[in-house]
């Protein structure tokens, strides 16, 4: 089964984008349109007629008369090999990972039927720092460079950078600093675009529950305007039912002593 398209429909498009428009899925891990098209993961490899080597679909432009095969045995084997190499440097302890069930790497492993790992697994080891709202686990980083590009090209903050060389290449905070020593605004764009659990938002649930259980502590909630809107989506309830009164009642039922609305506070 094949698909043909007029050159005008896909002119100046990358193969990955053109295939997506035609309803043909091509797996990818590092690609972000016009932001990160560096073919770092090599998961989007395709076979092009009259070309000896496989080509990355994310940064190979469509040309008139080009015949592209996206699901040949050679292509599938290359993708499996590349994914296994990525997994050989990845902490695959998925059962305790916050991204389990919502992880692009995990989904790719299922889609490509990866059931065994022939390569030695040696994930990077580093201390997990919980001093800031954004937490990085280096052992789960797949070097896709999404965080680097999003922070540079969209946010303009240049917090993340590439460190090391060769097989020791990794992503780290620029100039070897800690995150709290940078100008990071903790906007969360790097977390949103990370395909794995390498970058996550710090979970303070246990600390909150301990505070609620401590009779000597007075607990206060400050609600920002955005929270009043977003909590309905998080709780999967209709917006019309997610009233401010209902949210406050829920927080008081949990045991919080005071609930303040930041939009009503005048300084």
Which residues make up each language-model segment?
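Iron-sulfur-associated redox domains of electron-transfer enzymes in respiratory
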Residues: 12-77, 87, 202-265
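Short alpha-helix boundary/capping motifs
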Residues: 1, 9, 141, 184, ...
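Short, contiguous strand/loop micro-motifs
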Residues: 5, 134-135, 177-178, 233-236
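Fe-S ferredoxin-like electron-transfer domains
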Residues: 42-186, 192, 199-200, 204-218
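Short Gly/charged-rich anion-binding patches and loops
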Residues: 6, 14-15, 104, 136, ...
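Single conserved hydrophobic/aromatic residue that forms the stacking wall/gate
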Residues: 1-7, 11, 265-266
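Conserved adenylation A10 loop of the ANL superfamily
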Residues: 151, 266-267
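Short glycine-centered, acidic/aromatic-flanked micro-motifs in structured strand/loop junctions
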Residues: 5, 173, 223-225
């Amino acid at each position: 089964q094949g698909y043909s398209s007029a050159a005008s429909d896909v002119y100046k498009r990358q193969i990955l984008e053109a295939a997506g428009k035609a309803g043909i899925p091509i797996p990818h891990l590092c690609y972000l349109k016009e932001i990160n098209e560096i073919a770092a993961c090599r998961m989007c490899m395709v076979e092009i007629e009259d070309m000896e080597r496989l080509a990355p679909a994310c940064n190979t432009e469509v040309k008139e008369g080009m015949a592209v095969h996206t699901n040949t045995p050679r292509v599938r084997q290359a993708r499996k090999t590349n994914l296994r190499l990525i997994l050989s440097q990845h902490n695959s302890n998925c059962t305790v990972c916050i991204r389990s069930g919502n992880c692009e790497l995990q989904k790719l492993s299922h889609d490509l039927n990866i059931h065994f790992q022939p390569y030695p697994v040696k994930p990077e080891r580093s201390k997990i720092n919980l001093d800031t709202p954004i937490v990085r686990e280096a052992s789960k980083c797949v070097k896709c460079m999404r965080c680097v590009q999003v922070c540079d090209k969209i946010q303009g903050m240049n917090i993340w950078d590439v460190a090391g060389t060769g097989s020791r290449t990794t992503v780290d905070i620029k100039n070897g600093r800690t995150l709290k020593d940078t100008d990071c605004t903790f906007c969360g764009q790097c977390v949103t675009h990370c395909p794995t659990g390498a970058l996550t938002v710090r979970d303070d649930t246990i600390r909150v529950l301990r505070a609620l259980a401590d009779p000597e502590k007075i607990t206060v909630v400050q609600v920002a305007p955005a929270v009043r809107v977003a909590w309905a989506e998080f709780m999967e309830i209709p917006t019309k039912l997610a009233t401010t009164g209902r949210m406050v009642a829920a927080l008081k039922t949990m045991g919080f002593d005071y609930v303040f609305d930041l939009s009503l506070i005048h300084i």
